[in-house]
């Protein structure tokens, strides 16, 4: 079940110090995944389970994404045990600067609401996930978007039951528009998301982890 992404951008509250390529610890350039969570519950648990298997992942939460996590009883404190979590808190897009610092090699938006898909497809970057996606593309950083509304009939899990949705033509058109965006791969299921991530890992000469970063 999707919830709209807020129309006012915010950005940032981070649970730990952000890495930079010049840190004393020697953080390699473009060494991490940036995983953005929007206000969608569509295969949310499955998406997070895949993120947990990747090496070196930071979670970027929109305000709506943070609300939906709680609705689905996925608590921030639990996520912080396995990820660095960056939250939507100010209007200046501070976390996006980590893309300019060459911290991230891949931006994942999963799951992505139809609202976020529309923003990304039309070049609107007024939320943390849509801003991350836009700036990644400008830097030539590959993006993977797990779009929710990709078929005429979509069965999705709400917090209490399974729901059948029928995306409108405009939602389906926006997905196709998004597919044409540079440096963007659109996926439509957890299996496709896993396959896209596996291919990206292979490109980077990396492997799945058995635990989160």
Placement of each model-derived feature along the sequence:
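A cross-family phosphate/adenosyl-ligand binding-site feature
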Residues: 3-6, 14, 19-212
């Amino acid at each position: 079940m999707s919830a709209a992404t807020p129309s006012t951008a915010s950005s940032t509250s981070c649970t730990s110090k952000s890495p930079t390529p010049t840190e004393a610890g020697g953080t390699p350039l473009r060494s991490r995944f940036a995983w953005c969570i929007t206000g969608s519950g569509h295969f949310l648990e499955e998406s997070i389970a895949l993120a947990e298997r990747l090496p070196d992942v930071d979670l970027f939460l929109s305000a709506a994404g943070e609300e939906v996590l709680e609705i689905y009883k996925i608590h921030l404190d639990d996520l912080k045990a396995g990820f660095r979590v960056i939250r939507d808190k100010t209007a200046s897009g501070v976390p996006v600067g980590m893309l300019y610092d060459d911290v991230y090699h891949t931006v994942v938006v999963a799951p992505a609401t139809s609202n976020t898909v529309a923003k990304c497809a039309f070049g609107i970057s007024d939320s943390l996930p849509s801003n991350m996606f836009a700036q990644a593309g400008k830097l030539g950083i590959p993006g993977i978007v797990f779009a929710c509304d990709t078929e005429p009939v979509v069965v999705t899990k709400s917090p209490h039951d399974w729901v059948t949705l029928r995306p409108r033509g405009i939602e389906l058109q926006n997905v196709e528009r998004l597919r044409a965006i540079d440096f963007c791969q659109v996926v439509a299921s957890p299996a496709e998301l896993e396959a896209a991530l596996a291919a990206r890992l292979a490109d980077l000469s990396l492997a799945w982890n058995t635990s989160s970063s």
